[in-house]
Curated annotation (Swiss-Prot):
It comes from the Eukaryota. Residues 304-315 have a biased composition (Acidic residues). It comes from Takifugu rubripes (Japanese pufferfish). Residues 303-323 are annotated as: Disordered. Component of the bag6/bat3 complex. The gene is get4. This is Golgi to ER traffic protein 4 homolog. Belongs to the GET4 family. Keywords: Cytoplasm, Transport. Signal peptide: none annotated.
Length: 323
């Protein structure tokens, strides 16, 4: 028997063993012996890990989590979900689409308001960048954004879209967000914020795609440019100015549209950062913000190590929210 055939046979035997074990565990859960089944899963997890059977451990924990979710055993399911991540961390598993989809499946089944869900997504994002402290893998952000969009959690969805490379998906989500939750008078503000945030992350392509797609798809925006709404014209001109990189054009543009830019006090904060990134404006002494909002603002404004991340914005990711 060749080495390859031997490995295949070994893999098949392992899979058969996992299936037999899963059958016993499923029977315990179906009988309602949730605690006992949970402890059995954990025991098997540590046994597999001690034998470096990482694939078997991950598969068993993933299927176990799905089983507990199907019986609405949120705590046990969340615990096994965390063990899935632990396997990936300890085995230094590669970031593959199939694995990311599995992680987001677990995320989607967790109670939307549970602290376990927050901990899970934070840890998953960290793993997806090899624990480098960067903002997370763009594909994972995209999948999270799509899941949160389905839940109509638009602000968190936007945060993840911002750190993905899916400007088109972001725009379509914002159209729905604006139409379902926003005032008609604010139709331009939804996209303006997104464009400015993409630019703060030095993602010109994302900014351009979100702007063009949003203005094309939104039922309340007449065909342009030029647009009826001055703020949309400002965004259009800004994207052109960013490509040109001329400070005088940027300065005149901000001056011309000052009345529109007063509608949200954050616009000038964003524009200060954009001026530094694209037009050579020296940085101001930036204020320090706290909390989740502060994390977003500090990353957008380039505080600390986040500044380096902006250079790689289309390869990085992490959750963000700004209303």
């Amino acid at each position: 028997m060749s080495e390859q055939e031997s490995l295949r046979c070994s893999s098949a035997r392992n899979r058969g063993g996992v299936q037999r074990v899963e059958g016993k565990l499923r029977a315990s859960v179906e009988k309602g012996d949730y605690y006992e089944a949970h402890q059995m899963y954990r025991t098997l997890y540590f046994r597999y890990m001690s034998q470096a059977k990482h694939a078997e451990a991950r598969e068993l924990m993933y299927n176990g989590a799905l089983l507990f979710f199907s019986y609405n055993q949120q705590n046990s399911a969340a615990d096994l979900s965390m063990l899935v991540l632990e396997v990936l961390e300890k085995s230094k598993g590669k970031v593959e689409d199939e694995i990311l989809e599995c992680l987001v499946k677990l995320f989607s089944l967790m109670d939307q308001n549970s602290p376990e869900r927050v901990a899970f997504v934070s840890r998953a994002l960290k793993w997806s960048t090899g624990g480098s402290g960067k903002l997370g893998h763009p594909r994972l952000h995209q999948l999270l954004a799509l899941t949160l969009w389905k839940e109509q959690n638009y602000s968190e969805s936007x945060y993840h879209f911002l750190h993905s490379s899916d400007g088109e998906g972001c725009a379509q989500m914002l159209v729905e967000y604006s139409a379902s939750r926003g005032f008609h008078s604010e139709v331009d503000m939804f996209v303006a914020q997104a464009v400015l945030q993409f630019l703060c992350l030095k993602n010109k392509n994302g900014a351009s795609v979100v702007x063009s797609t949003y203005t094309e798809k939104h039922p309340s925006i007449e065909k342009g440019p030029p647009f009826v709404q001055p703020l949309l014209n400002f965004i259009w001109f800004l994207l052109l100015a960013v490509d040109g990189g001329k400070l005088t054009v940027f300065t005149v543009l901000c001056e011309q549209y000052k009345p529109s830019l007063k509608r949200d006090p954050m616009y000038n904060e964003y524009l200060d950062r954009i001026g530094q990134l694209f037009f050579g404006v020296p940085p101001k002494q930036s204020p320090s913000y706290g909390g989740l909002l502060g994390n977003l603002l500090n990353s957008l404004m380039g505080s600390g190590e986040e500044d380096d991340m902006a250079e790689e914005a289309q390869e990085d990711s992490s959750p963000i929210e700004l209303d």
